[in-house]
Amino acid sequence: IEISKKSYIKWCGINDTRHISVILNNKVTLHNFYVPAGGDVPDTESNVKFAHKIAFLKEMISYFKEDKTKKKILVGDLNIAPYENDVWSHRQLLNVVSHTPIETENLKKLLNDGNWVDIMRKFIPLEEKVFSWWSYRNRDWKKSNRGRRLDHVWLSEDLLSSAKKMIVYKEARDWEKPSDHVPVVLEIDL
């Protein structure tokens, strides 16, 4: 597929290239994001990294609320596991960065206000646990399975029928020198 236009936005006034987008020749806009991780302390007053993460999300919400583009895809490491079954223990992670109420509420607002569909949850029901990230600190990641779903693929509703298959490639976590994230792959017929 040829690319007709590419761009990025300075989110929060910082030129840290956390976003890139392309418009494909078939008029589909593809956005790729890396949302700030947010540091270790889930408090916007005492942790500037967490404050930046929340500000970044709010800016994304404003942007996509105004964006009336049809045929769009959003992918990336959003560093938030929004639903109870996107983490190994909802109760134990409520005060851990990536699953706090302020993060999950803002991500769900972004999803709703931007008219996105969380396509992974169309293929894997909310009742099922699904993870795309496991800590490097846990050597026996499979046995403990203390993961989180931080990597996302969202579609505009007009592309839903194009989505054919979704794969979370957990096997990649066993590769030599793996990432702590595994690929999430959407097969889509554009």
Question: Where on the chain are the PLM-derived regions?
Answer:
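Structured beta-strand-rich core segments of catalytic domains in phosphoester-bond hydrolases
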Residues: I1-D40
